Amino acid sequence: MLSRRDLFDARLQLICLDDAGTKDGHSEIDFVDAPSDLVPGVYEGGLKTWECSLDLVDCLHSIYGPDVANKIRGKRVIELGCGTAIPSIYLLHSIFSADPGQSAGDVIVHLQDYNELVLRLVTLPNVILAWYMSPASSAFRASAGTEAEQAEDAEPLPPADPTQPGELPITPGLKAAFLESLRTYRVDLKFFSGSWATLDVDKPGRGPYDILLTSETIYRTASLQSLVDLMRRATSGWARGGSLDEAASRLTLSDTDGLQRLADEPYLCLVAAKLVYFGVGGGVNDFTEAIERPKDGKRLGRVQTVLERNRGVKRSVMRVVWESL
């Protein structure tokens, strides 16, 4: 079970801020209180947790199993349109729950969202909660608990139990302990805001990425090509050698062993989405067509469904295998 910041708490923070910013004539509080979850080009719905991000966690667990922390050691991970970043939080919590003494290589985790506000209000707080609810924060919790008992005005720390609601004070001591854990567990964490077209994944220290994750990002056809281009550039360093058909043939739908074999692939590009986004225009078919049957006739890769949800709103997790460059 994972902890995340409540939207109400984020809203309260904005209300209490005297210098809440604006974007294109909209105040930051407007995004939280908006009746719509989407204001194209202004706010892309990242403050809320959507179903497909949970599907992506299920898929990652099926692929990597309980030893996920060790299996992603030495890898570069990026989550595009991360919002509350639940898939990345799952990976980070797994790392913080493992033995740091067995760390064989750094883990690079990059989180991107259109809105810098989203990164501040929910993404980073959720990352901190993933650490706080793990064994990695035990030393801090023990020392801070003793200090809180000695100081009358100190705020008590909540239990490290995701089933219980609570308020976590962000103190200088907590920030220092969190940063120290990043070093101890060898996690390189970075945040990026802005459109997909502005994210330069070719800069030193960024791509190519071994694991690319994105969920609920293919809902708008107008931005689909920009997303596909970024996904391909972000993993392009691995899309070399071997045939596309050979790579795609290593997995069949509903093949549990096949899902586990994905952990050994050179790169993993996973997209979680609803079959159709009513009222917006995008969906799985448009995404698949943009990759397999683009307008210029040059196939970019192949899209495979690796997980399906047929109850309620139909959803799926897709794996993208790119053509060799």
Segments (PLM) and residue ranges:
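S-adenosylmethionine-dependent methyltransferases
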Residues: 1-325
